[in-house]
Amino acid sequence: MDAEHTDAQHLMGLLCLHDQHYNDALEWIVRAIRRAPKPEYLASFGTALQQHGRFEEALNVVDNAIQLRPDDAGLWRQRGDILSQLSRLDQALASFQHALKLDPDHHDTLRKSGTLLHKLGRNEEAIAHLDLSDKLFPNHAPTLHTRAWILYTLKRFEESATEGKRAHQLAPDKADTCNNLGLSLRRLGRDEEALAWFEKAIAIEPHLVAAFNNKLTTLFHLHRFDEVFALSEHMKALGLNDTVTDWNVALARLLTGDFEAGWRGHQIRLKLPSAKYARFAQPTWLGDQDIAGKTILVAADEGLGDTIHFVRYVPMLAARGARVILAVQDPLRRLMSPLGGVSHHVPMSAAGTLPHFDLHCPISSLPLAFGTRLDTIPADMPYLPSPPDDRIQAWDNRLGPRTRLRVGLAWSGDPAHVNDQARSIPLRTLSRILDADATFISLQKGPRPSDATVLRERHDIVDLTADLTDFAETAALMSCLDLVITVDTSIAHLAGALGRPTWLLLPWTPDYRWLLDRTDSPWYPSMRLFRQTERREYESVLDRVRDELRARASSFEPRAH
Protein backbone atom coordinates (compact mmCIF):
# COMPACT_ATOMS: atom_id res chain seq x y z
CA MET A 1 0.00 0.00 0.00
CA ASP A 2 2.90 2.36 0.79
CA ALA A 3 4.35 1.93 -2.73
CA GLU A 4 0.93 2.54 -4.21
CA HIS A 5 0.59 5.65 -2.05
CA THR A 6 3.88 7.14 -3.31
CA ASP A 7 2.94 6.32 -6.90
CA ALA A 8 -0.38 8.10 -6.35
CA GLN A 9 1.43 11.17 -4.99
CA HIS A 10 3.74 11.10 -8.00
CA LEU A 11 0.75 10.76 -10.33
CA MET A 12 -0.96 13.73 -8.67
CA GLY A 13 2.20 15.73 -9.28
CA LEU A 14 2.19 14.76 -12.96
CA LEU A 15 -1.46 15.78 -13.30
CA CYS A 16 -0.71 19.17 -11.72
CA LEU A 17 2.29 19.51 -14.03
CA HIS A 18 0.08 18.78 -17.03
CA ASP A 19 -2.35 21.48 -15.89
CA GLN A 20 0.57 23.92 -15.36
CA HIS A 21 -0.01 24.12 -11.60
CA TYR A 22 3.73 24.03 -10.95
CA ASN A 23 3.77 24.77 -7.21
CA ASP A 24 1.22 22.01 -6.53
CA ALA A 25 3.20 19.67 -8.80
CA LEU A 26 6.39 20.32 -6.86
CA GLU A 27 4.63 19.70 -3.56
CA TRP A 28 3.13 16.34 -4.60
CA ILE A 29 6.31 15.06 -6.24
CA VAL A 30 8.47 16.05 -3.25
CA ARG A 31 6.14 14.06 -0.99
CA ALA A 32 6.66 11.00 -3.19
CA ILE A 33 10.44 11.47 -3.24
CA ARG A 34 10.59 11.72 0.56
CA ARG A 35 8.95 8.32 0.78
CA ALA A 36 10.87 6.72 -2.12
CA PRO A 37 13.54 8.64 -4.09
CA LYS A 38 13.01 6.73 -7.32
CA PRO A 39 14.76 7.95 -10.49
CA GLU A 40 11.44 8.48 -12.25
CA TYR A 41 10.20 10.66 -9.38
CA LEU A 42 13.41 12.68 -9.50
CA ALA A 43 13.02 13.07 -13.27
CA SER A 44 9.50 14.46 -12.77
CA PHE A 45 10.79 16.77 -10.03
CA GLY A 46 13.45 17.98 -12.47
CA THR A 47 10.80 18.63 -15.12
CA ALA A 48 8.70 20.64 -12.65
CA LEU A 49 11.75 22.71 -11.71
CA GLN A 50 12.49 23.26 -15.40
CA GLN A 51 8.96 24.50 -15.98
CA HIS A 52 9.47 26.83 -13.00
CA GLY A 53 12.68 28.23 -14.56
CA ARG A 54 14.85 26.77 -11.77
CA PHE A 55 17.35 25.14 -14.11
CA GLU A 56 20.38 24.75 -11.82
CA GLU A 57 18.23 22.98 -9.22
CA ALA A 58 16.71 20.83 -11.96
CA LEU A 59 20.19 19.83 -13.13
CA ASN A 60 21.21 18.76 -9.61
CA VAL A 61 18.05 16.67 -9.25
CA VAL A 62 18.52 14.94 -12.62
CA ASP A 63 22.20 14.28 -11.82
CA ASN A 64 21.03 12.52 -8.65
CA ALA A 65 18.61 10.45 -10.73
CA ILE A 66 21.42 9.49 -13.13
CA GLN A 67 23.52 8.27 -10.20
CA LEU A 68 20.68 5.91 -9.33
CA ARG A 69 20.09 4.80 -12.93
CA PRO A 70 23.14 5.66 -15.11
CA ASP A 71 21.96 3.66 -18.12
CA ASP A 72 18.67 5.53 -18.53
CA ALA A 73 18.85 7.36 -21.90
CA GLY A 74 15.81 9.45 -20.99
CA LEU A 75 17.59 10.94 -17.99
CA TRP A 76 20.61 11.85 -20.13
CA ARG A 77 18.25 13.47 -22.64
CA GLN A 78 16.65 15.48 -19.87
CA ARG A 79 20.08 16.52 -18.65
CA GLY A 80 20.89 17.71 -22.19
CA ASP A 81 17.66 19.73 -22.32
CA ILE A 82 18.44 21.47 -19.02
CA LEU A 83 22.01 22.27 -20.04
CA SER A 84 20.67 23.69 -23.31
CA GLN A 85 18.36 25.94 -21.30
CA LEU A 86 21.41 27.05 -19.31
CA SER A 87 23.26 27.78 -22.62
CA ARG A 88 25.99 25.30 -21.67
CA LEU A 89 26.01 23.94 -25.19
CA ASP A 90 29.13 21.75 -25.13
CA GLN A 91 27.93 19.96 -22.00
CA ALA A 92 24.41 19.64 -23.41
CA LEU A 93 25.79 18.05 -26.57
CA ALA A 94 27.88 15.61 -24.51
CA SER A 95 24.74 14.56 -22.61
CA PHE A 96 22.76 14.02 -25.82
CA GLN A 97 25.65 12.06 -27.32
CA HIS A 98 25.74 9.84 -24.23
CA ALA A 99 21.99 9.32 -24.58
CA LEU A 100 22.54 8.24 -28.19
CA LYS A 101 25.07 5.62 -27.09
CA LEU A 102 22.35 4.16 -24.88
CA ASP A 103 19.54 4.62 -27.43
CA PRO A 104 21.08 5.20 -30.90
CA ASP A 105 17.80 5.42 -32.80
CA HIS A 106 16.04 8.12 -30.81
CA HIS A 107 15.15 10.63 -33.51
CA ASP A 108 14.47 13.59 -31.20
CA THR A 109 17.89 13.23 -29.56
CA LEU A 110 19.45 13.16 -33.02
CA ARG A 111 17.51 16.32 -33.94
CA LYS A 112 18.53 18.14 -30.76
CA SER A 113 22.15 17.07 -31.22
CA GLY A 114 22.01 18.41 -34.77
CA THR A 115 20.65 21.73 -33.54
CA LEU A 116 23.42 22.05 -30.94
CA LEU A 117 26.12 21.09 -33.43
CA HIS A 118 24.82 23.86 -35.68
CA LYS A 119 24.95 26.38 -32.83
CA LEU A 120 28.53 25.27 -32.17
CA GLY A 121 29.43 25.83 -35.83
CA ARG A 122 29.81 22.12 -36.64
CA ASN A 123 27.34 22.17 -39.50
CA GLU A 124 28.43 19.11 -41.47
CA GLU A 125 28.10 16.96 -38.32
CA ALA A 126 24.74 18.61 -37.66
CA ILE A 127 23.46 17.61 -41.10
CA ALA A 128 24.61 14.00 -40.55
CA HIS A 129 22.60 13.80 -37.31
CA LEU A 130 19.52 15.33 -38.91
CA ASP A 131 19.78 13.03 -41.93
CA LEU A 132 19.65 10.02 -39.61
CA SER A 133 16.77 11.54 -37.65
CA ASP A 134 14.86 12.05 -40.91
CA LYS A 135 15.42 8.43 -41.94
CA LEU A 136 14.27 7.10 -38.58
CA PHE A 137 11.27 9.42 -38.34
CA PRO A 138 10.49 10.80 -41.80
CA ASN A 139 8.24 13.77 -42.45
CA HIS A 140 8.88 15.37 -39.07
CA ALA A 141 8.43 19.10 -39.67
CA PRO A 142 10.78 20.41 -36.92
CA THR A 143 13.60 18.19 -38.20
CA LEU A 144 13.09 19.36 -41.78
CA HIS A 145 12.87 23.00 -40.66
CA THR A 146 16.17 22.76 -38.77
CA ARG A 147 17.83 20.85 -41.60
CA ALA A 148 16.71 23.48 -44.13
CA TRP A 149 18.22 26.27 -42.05
CA ILE A 150 21.57 24.52 -41.60
CA LEU A 151 21.74 23.82 -45.34
CA TYR A 152 21.15 27.54 -45.84
CA THR A 153 24.06 28.43 -43.56
CA LEU A 154 26.20 26.00 -45.59
CA LYS A 155 25.16 27.90 -48.75
CA ARG A 156 23.47 24.78 -50.14
CA PHE A 157 20.50 26.86 -51.18
CA GLU A 158 18.77 24.45 -53.59
CA GLU A 159 18.71 21.71 -50.95
CA SER A 160 17.62 24.20 -48.31
CA ALA A 161 14.68 25.32 -50.46
CA THR A 162 13.65 21.71 -51.09
CA GLU A 163 13.70 20.87 -47.37
CA GLY A 164 11.90 24.11 -46.54
CA LYS A 165 9.07 23.23 -48.92
CA ARG A 166 8.78 19.76 -47.35
CA ALA A 167 8.61 21.34 -43.89
CA HIS A 168 5.97 23.82 -45.05
CA GLN A 169 3.77 21.06 -46.50
CA LEU A 170 3.82 19.31 -43.13
CA ALA A 171 3.38 22.47 -41.02
CA PRO A 172 1.86 25.19 -43.22
CA ASP A 173 1.21 27.50 -40.25
CA LYS A 174 4.88 28.01 -39.34
CA ALA A 175 5.94 31.54 -40.27
CA ASP A 176 9.64 30.85 -39.64
CA THR A 177 9.62 28.07 -42.22
CA CYS A 178 8.12 30.40 -44.83
CA ASN A 179 10.61 33.12 -43.96
CA ASN A 180 13.63 30.81 -44.20
CA LEU A 181 12.38 29.35 -47.48
CA GLY A 182 12.18 32.88 -48.85
CA LEU A 183 15.80 33.46 -47.85
CA SER A 184 16.96 30.39 -49.77
CA LEU A 185 15.03 31.41 -52.87
CA ARG A 186 16.47 34.92 -52.69
CA ARG A 187 19.99 33.49 -52.58
CA LEU A 188 19.09 31.52 -55.69
CA GLY A 189 18.14 34.76 -57.44
CA ARG A 190 14.44 33.88 -57.43
CA ASP A 191 13.36 37.14 -55.82
CA GLU A 192 9.74 37.17 -56.97
CA GLU A 193 9.17 33.72 -55.44
CA ALA A 194 11.03 34.77 -52.30
CA LEU A 195 8.83 37.83 -51.97
CA ALA A 196 5.71 35.65 -51.99
CA TRP A 197 7.09 33.50 -49.16
CA PHE A 198 7.98 36.51 -47.02
CA GLU A 199 4.45 37.81 -47.54
CA LYS A 200 3.07 34.41 -46.55
CA ALA A 201 5.17 34.50 -43.36
CA ILE A 202 3.78 37.95 -42.54
CA ALA A 203 0.21 36.74 -43.17
CA ILE A 204 0.78 33.94 -40.64
CA GLU A 205 2.61 36.11 -38.11
CA PRO A 206 1.80 39.79 -38.77
CA HIS A 207 4.53 41.11 -36.46
CA LEU A 208 7.45 38.94 -37.59
CA VAL A 209 10.15 41.60 -37.98
CA ALA A 210 12.56 39.27 -39.78
CA ALA A 211 10.01 38.60 -42.53
CA PHE A 212 9.32 42.32 -42.96
CA ASN A 213 13.04 43.05 -43.19
CA ASN A 214 13.54 40.26 -45.70
CA LYS A 215 10.63 41.51 -47.77
CA LEU A 216 12.16 44.99 -47.75
CA THR A 217 15.57 43.62 -48.79
CA THR A 218 13.97 41.64 -51.62
CA LEU A 219 12.17 44.72 -52.91
CA PHE A 220 15.56 46.44 -52.74
CA HIS A 221 17.12 43.73 -54.95
CA LEU A 222 14.18 44.01 -57.34
CA HIS A 223 14.93 47.76 -57.60
CA ARG A 224 11.41 48.58 -56.40
CA PHE A 225 12.69 51.42 -54.26
CA ASP A 226 9.41 53.32 -53.85
CA GLU A 227 8.00 50.15 -52.27
CA VAL A 228 11.09 49.87 -50.05
CA PHE A 229 10.47 53.34 -48.64
CA ALA A 230 6.71 52.75 -48.31
CA LEU A 231 7.25 49.45 -46.49
CA SER A 232 9.69 51.14 -44.13
CA GLU A 233 7.04 53.73 -43.22
CA HIS A 234 4.47 50.95 -42.74
CA MET A 235 6.86 49.13 -40.39
CA LYS A 236 7.36 52.33 -38.39
CA ALA A 237 3.59 52.69 -38.05
CA LEU A 238 3.45 49.12 -36.69
CA GLY A 239 6.41 49.72 -34.38
CA LEU A 240 8.43 47.05 -36.19
CA ASN A 241 11.33 48.93 -37.74
CA ASP A 242 14.76 48.29 -36.25
CA THR A 243 18.39 49.08 -37.02
CA VAL A 244 18.44 46.54 -39.86
CA THR A 245 15.43 48.23 -41.47
CA ASP A 246 16.95 51.68 -41.12
CA TRP A 247 20.29 50.45 -42.50
CA ASN A 248 18.73 48.97 -45.62
CA VAL A 249 16.67 52.11 -46.22
CA ALA A 250 19.83 54.21 -45.91
CA LEU A 251 21.58 52.02 -48.49
CA ALA A 252 18.59 52.39 -50.82
CA ARG A 253 18.74 56.18 -50.43
CA LEU A 254 22.44 56.24 -51.26
CA LEU A 255 22.12 53.81 -54.17
CA THR A 256 19.41 55.98 -55.73
CA GLY A 257 21.50 59.13 -55.29
CA ASP A 258 19.68 60.69 -52.33
CA PHE A 259 22.89 61.50 -50.49
CA GLU A 260 21.37 63.97 -48.03
CA ALA A 261 19.08 61.39 -46.43
CA GLY A 262 21.44 58.53 -47.22
CA TRP A 263 24.49 59.80 -45.33
CA ARG A 264 22.35 60.59 -42.28
CA GLY A 265 20.93 57.08 -42.35
CA HIS A 266 24.39 55.63 -42.99
CA GLN A 267 25.24 56.46 -39.36
CA ILE A 268 23.02 53.58 -38.24
CA ARG A 269 25.87 51.21 -39.19
CA LEU A 270 27.52 52.15 -35.90
CA LYS A 271 24.58 50.59 -34.03
CA LEU A 272 24.58 47.31 -35.96
CA PRO A 273 25.79 44.16 -34.15
CA SER A 274 28.69 43.98 -36.63
CA ALA A 275 29.94 47.49 -35.77
CA LYS A 276 33.63 47.58 -34.82
CA TYR A 277 34.12 51.25 -33.97
CA ALA A 278 35.52 51.96 -30.50
CA ARG A 279 33.78 54.22 -28.00
CA PHE A 280 35.56 57.44 -27.07
CA ALA A 281 34.89 60.01 -24.36
CA GLN A 282 35.60 62.86 -26.77
CA PRO A 283 32.78 64.28 -28.94
CA THR A 284 32.12 62.96 -32.43
CA TRP A 285 32.71 65.50 -35.19
CA LEU A 286 30.15 65.44 -37.99
CA GLY A 287 30.92 68.80 -39.59
CA ASP A 288 28.96 70.82 -37.07
CA GLN A 289 31.81 72.81 -35.50
CA ASP A 290 35.00 74.63 -36.42
CA ILE A 291 38.00 72.30 -36.29
CA ALA A 292 40.76 74.85 -36.85
CA GLY A 293 43.44 74.25 -34.24
CA LYS A 294 41.74 71.04 -33.03
CA THR A 295 43.18 67.53 -33.04
CA ILE A 296 40.82 65.01 -34.61
CA LEU A 297 41.12 61.24 -34.61
CA VAL A 298 39.91 59.63 -37.83
CA ALA A 299 39.58 55.85 -37.44
CA ALA A 300 38.56 53.10 -39.82
CA ASP A 301 35.17 51.63 -38.96
CA GLU A 302 34.29 49.32 -41.86
CA GLY A 303 36.26 47.24 -44.37
CA LEU A 304 39.56 47.82 -46.13
CA GLY A 305 37.84 49.09 -49.26
CA ASP A 306 35.79 51.58 -47.26
CA THR A 307 38.93 52.94 -45.63
CA ILE A 308 40.61 53.41 -49.03
CA HIS A 309 37.44 54.98 -50.41
CA PHE A 310 36.97 57.59 -47.68
CA VAL A 311 40.57 58.45 -46.79
CA ARG A 312 40.30 61.02 -49.63
CA TYR A 313 38.62 63.34 -47.10
CA VAL A 314 41.58 63.44 -44.69
CA PRO A 315 43.50 66.23 -46.51
CA MET A 316 40.25 68.24 -46.46
CA LEU A 317 40.32 68.11 -42.65
CA ALA A 318 43.86 69.41 -42.64
CA ALA A 319 42.82 72.17 -45.05
CA ARG A 320 40.34 73.33 -42.39
CA GLY A 321 43.17 73.70 -39.92
CA ALA A 322 42.81 70.42 -38.05
CA ARG A 323 45.63 68.23 -36.83
CA VAL A 324 44.70 64.70 -37.98
CA ILE A 325 45.52 61.44 -36.23
CA LEU A 326 44.76 58.55 -38.60
CA ALA A 327 44.08 54.96 -37.49
CA VAL A 328 43.70 52.40 -40.28
CA GLN A 329 43.90 48.62 -40.57
CA ASP A 330 47.40 47.12 -40.48
CA PRO A 331 47.46 46.02 -44.16
CA LEU A 332 46.90 49.68 -45.14
CA ARG A 333 49.34 51.41 -42.80
CA ARG A 334 52.42 51.43 -45.05
CA LEU A 335 50.32 52.45 -48.06
CA MET A 336 48.86 55.43 -46.22
CA SER A 337 51.87 56.50 -44.17
CA PRO A 338 52.92 59.18 -46.74
CA LEU A 339 49.35 60.53 -47.05
CA GLY A 340 49.20 64.32 -46.98
CA GLY A 341 47.42 66.08 -44.14
CA VAL A 342 48.13 63.43 -41.49
CA SER A 343 50.06 64.54 -38.41
CA HIS A 344 50.25 61.17 -36.71
CA HIS A 345 49.58 57.56 -37.73
CA VAL A 346 48.50 55.03 -35.10
CA PRO A 347 47.61 51.34 -35.40
CA MET A 348 43.98 50.31 -34.91
CA SER A 349 45.07 48.23 -31.92
CA ALA A 350 46.32 51.35 -30.07
CA ALA A 351 42.86 52.50 -28.92
CA GLY A 352 43.96 52.45 -25.28
CA THR A 353 47.22 54.37 -25.82
CA LEU A 354 46.23 57.11 -28.24
CA PRO A 355 47.81 60.56 -28.13
CA HIS A 356 45.62 63.46 -27.04
CA PHE A 357 42.77 64.40 -29.36
CA ASP A 358 39.80 66.75 -29.07
CA LEU A 359 37.33 65.14 -31.47
CA HIS A 360 36.91 61.92 -33.39
CA CYS A 361 35.16 60.86 -36.58
CA PRO A 362 34.64 57.38 -38.05
CA ILE A 363 36.22 57.46 -41.50
CA SER A 364 32.97 56.38 -43.19
CA SER A 365 31.18 59.36 -41.60
CA LEU A 366 33.36 61.90 -43.40
CA PRO A 367 30.99 62.20 -46.41
CA LEU A 368 28.23 63.19 -43.98
CA ALA A 369 30.52 65.61 -42.16
CA PHE A 370 31.39 67.34 -45.44
CA GLY A 371 27.80 67.31 -46.73
CA THR A 372 28.76 65.36 -49.84
CA ARG A 373 26.35 65.50 -52.77
CA LEU A 374 26.68 63.84 -56.15
CA ASP A 375 28.05 67.06 -57.59
CA THR A 376 30.53 67.69 -54.75
CA ILE A 377 32.23 64.29 -54.53
CA PRO A 378 35.98 64.93 -54.05
CA ALA A 379 37.45 63.12 -57.05
CA ASP A 380 40.90 64.58 -57.66
CA MET A 381 43.01 61.58 -58.64
CA PRO A 382 45.18 59.99 -57.54
CA TYR A 383 44.62 60.79 -53.88
CA LEU A 384 46.80 57.98 -52.58
CA PRO A 385 50.55 58.63 -52.65
CA SER A 386 52.41 57.05 -55.56
CA PRO A 387 54.35 53.93 -54.49
CA PRO A 388 58.14 54.31 -54.19
CA ASP A 389 59.94 54.19 -57.53
CA ASP A 390 62.22 51.36 -56.42
CA ARG A 391 59.25 49.11 -55.58
CA ILE A 392 57.57 49.88 -58.91
CA GLN A 393 60.82 49.11 -60.72
CA ALA A 394 61.24 45.85 -58.80
CA TRP A 395 57.80 44.65 -59.84
CA ASP A 396 58.27 45.86 -63.39
CA ASN A 397 61.46 43.81 -63.63
CA ARG A 398 59.67 40.71 -62.37
CA LEU A 399 56.96 41.07 -65.01
CA GLY A 400 59.53 41.13 -67.79
CA PRO A 401 59.41 42.85 -71.20
CA ARG A 402 56.28 44.93 -71.80
CA THR A 403 55.37 43.38 -75.13
CA ARG A 404 51.64 43.02 -74.47
CA LEU A 405 48.90 44.78 -72.54
CA ARG A 406 49.28 44.02 -68.83
CA VAL A 407 45.96 43.28 -67.13
CA GLY A 408 45.52 42.72 -63.39
CA LEU A 409 42.69 40.44 -62.25
CA ALA A 410 40.73 40.10 -59.00
CA TRP A 411 37.62 37.94 -59.06
CA SER A 412 36.42 37.43 -55.49
CA GLY A 413 36.09 39.20 -52.16
CA ASP A 414 35.54 38.10 -48.59
CA PRO A 415 33.50 34.85 -48.62
CA ALA A 416 31.78 36.00 -45.42
CA HIS A 417 30.47 39.19 -47.05
CA VAL A 418 26.67 39.29 -47.14
CA ASN A 419 26.67 39.89 -50.90
CA ASP A 420 29.54 37.55 -51.75
CA GLN A 421 27.48 35.21 -53.90
CA ALA A 422 26.38 38.10 -56.11
CA ARG A 423 29.65 39.98 -56.40
CA SER A 424 32.32 37.24 -56.63
CA ILE A 425 32.95 35.31 -59.85
CA PRO A 426 34.47 31.81 -60.08
CA LEU A 427 37.80 31.96 -61.90
CA ARG A 428 36.59 29.31 -64.32
CA THR A 429 33.78 31.69 -65.35
CA LEU A 430 36.15 34.66 -65.59
CA SER A 431 38.42 32.62 -67.85
CA ARG A 432 36.23 33.44 -70.86
CA ILE A 433 38.04 36.80 -71.14
CA LEU A 434 41.53 35.27 -71.15
CA ASP A 435 41.77 34.67 -74.90
CA ALA A 436 42.67 38.33 -75.46
CA ASP A 437 46.26 38.98 -76.50
CA ALA A 438 47.36 40.28 -73.10
CA THR A 439 49.50 39.35 -70.11
CA PHE A 440 47.22 38.57 -67.17
CA ILE A 441 48.49 39.11 -63.62
CA SER A 442 46.62 37.86 -60.56
CA LEU A 443 45.89 40.38 -57.82
CA GLN A 444 43.76 37.82 -55.98
CA LYS A 445 45.07 37.11 -52.50
CA GLY A 446 43.92 33.87 -50.90
CA PRO A 447 41.96 32.32 -53.78
CA ARG A 448 39.26 29.84 -52.83
CA PRO A 449 40.15 26.15 -53.21
CA SER A 450 38.16 25.77 -56.45
CA ASP A 451 39.79 28.90 -57.89
CA ALA A 452 43.26 27.81 -56.75
CA THR A 453 42.77 24.58 -58.71
CA VAL A 454 41.90 26.53 -61.87
CA LEU A 455 44.82 28.89 -61.27
CA ARG A 456 47.23 25.94 -61.15
CA GLU A 457 45.76 24.58 -64.39
CA ARG A 458 46.23 27.81 -66.29
CA HIS A 459 49.60 28.99 -67.52
CA ASP A 460 48.33 32.30 -68.88
CA ILE A 461 47.93 34.00 -65.48
CA VAL A 462 51.05 35.29 -63.75
CA ASP A 463 50.63 34.72 -60.01
CA LEU A 464 53.02 36.66 -57.79
CA THR A 465 50.53 37.20 -54.97
CA ALA A 466 52.66 35.33 -52.42
CA ASP A 467 54.85 38.46 -52.33
CA LEU A 468 51.97 40.92 -52.01
CA THR A 469 52.55 41.33 -48.28
CA ASP A 470 50.39 44.44 -47.89
CA PHE A 471 48.53 47.04 -49.93
CA ALA A 472 51.68 49.08 -50.50
CA GLU A 473 53.17 46.17 -52.46
CA THR A 474 49.90 45.65 -54.34
CA ALA A 475 49.88 49.35 -55.23
CA ALA A 476 53.43 49.08 -56.58
CA LEU A 477 52.48 46.09 -58.73
CA MET A 478 49.33 47.88 -59.94
CA SER A 479 51.47 50.80 -61.04
CA CYS A 480 53.11 48.46 -63.57
CA LEU A 481 49.79 47.46 -65.14
CA ASP A 482 47.85 48.97 -68.01
CA LEU A 483 44.43 47.88 -66.78
CA VAL A 484 42.80 46.31 -63.72
CA ILE A 485 39.70 44.15 -64.15
CA THR A 486 38.09 43.40 -60.81
CA VAL A 487 34.92 42.66 -58.93
CA ASP A 488 33.81 44.97 -56.11
CA THR A 489 36.55 44.46 -53.51
CA SER A 490 39.26 46.53 -51.88
CA ILE A 491 41.33 45.96 -55.06
CA ALA A 492 38.79 48.06 -56.99
CA HIS A 493 39.12 50.93 -54.51
CA LEU A 494 42.91 50.71 -54.51
CA ALA A 495 43.05 50.83 -58.31
CA GLY A 496 40.58 53.72 -58.45
CA ALA A 497 42.35 55.69 -55.71
CA LEU A 498 45.66 55.32 -57.59
CA GLY A 499 43.98 56.58 -60.74
CA ARG A 500 44.68 53.31 -62.58
CA PRO A 501 42.43 52.39 -65.54
CA THR A 502 39.93 50.00 -64.00
CA TRP A 503 37.03 47.92 -65.29
CA LEU A 504 34.68 47.04 -62.46
CA LEU A 505 32.34 44.04 -62.77
CA LEU A 506 29.11 44.66 -60.86
CA PRO A 507 26.09 42.58 -59.87
CA TRP A 508 22.57 43.68 -60.73
CA THR A 509 22.20 45.28 -57.30
CA PRO A 510 25.60 46.75 -56.48
CA ASP A 511 27.02 48.40 -53.41
CA TYR A 512 25.51 51.86 -52.90
CA ARG A 513 28.59 53.79 -54.04
CA TRP A 514 28.29 52.53 -57.63
CA LEU A 515 24.78 53.97 -58.01
CA LEU A 516 22.51 52.71 -60.82
CA ASP A 517 22.27 52.93 -64.61
CA ARG A 518 25.65 54.46 -65.33
CA THR A 519 28.93 53.18 -66.76
CA ASP A 520 31.17 55.66 -64.95
CA SER A 521 31.83 56.38 -61.29
CA PRO A 522 31.79 59.91 -59.86
CA TRP A 523 34.09 58.59 -57.11
CA TYR A 524 36.77 57.23 -59.46
CA PRO A 525 37.13 58.97 -62.86
CA SER A 526 39.50 56.26 -64.19
CA MET A 527 36.92 53.53 -63.66
CA ARG A 528 34.39 51.97 -66.04
CA LEU A 529 31.45 49.97 -64.72
CA PHE A 530 30.28 46.76 -66.39
CA ARG A 531 26.92 45.84 -64.88
CA GLN A 532 24.80 42.73 -64.87
CA THR A 533 21.41 43.05 -66.52
CA GLU A 534 18.19 41.87 -64.92
CA ARG A 535 19.20 38.33 -65.89
CA ARG A 536 21.76 38.54 -63.07
CA GLU A 537 24.50 36.48 -64.69
CA TYR A 538 28.10 37.36 -65.41
CA GLU A 539 28.54 35.50 -68.70
CA SER A 540 27.06 38.29 -70.83
CA VAL A 541 28.99 40.89 -68.80
CA LEU A 542 32.22 39.01 -69.44
CA ASP A 543 31.41 38.71 -73.14
CA ARG A 544 31.23 42.51 -73.32
CA VAL A 545 34.48 42.81 -71.40
CA ARG A 546 36.18 40.26 -73.66
CA ASP A 547 35.17 42.13 -76.82
CA GLU A 548 36.44 45.45 -75.48
CA LEU A 549 39.59 43.86 -74.09
CA ARG A 550 40.43 42.28 -77.43
CA ALA A 551 40.11 45.68 -79.11
CA ARG A 552 42.26 47.34 -76.46
CA ALA A 553 44.90 44.61 -76.59
CA SER A 554 45.11 44.74 -80.38
CA SER A 555 45.87 48.47 -80.30
CA PHE A 556 48.55 48.15 -77.60
CA GLU A 557 51.96 49.45 -78.59
CA PRO A 558 54.88 47.64 -76.91
CA ARG A 559 57.14 49.82 -74.79
CA ALA A 560 60.77 49.51 -73.88
CA HIS A 561 61.42 47.61 -70.68
Regions inferred by a protein language model and the residue ranges of each:
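Alpha-helical solenoid repeat scaffolds of the TPR/TPR-like class and their adjacent stem/linker regions
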Residues: 1-483, 488-561
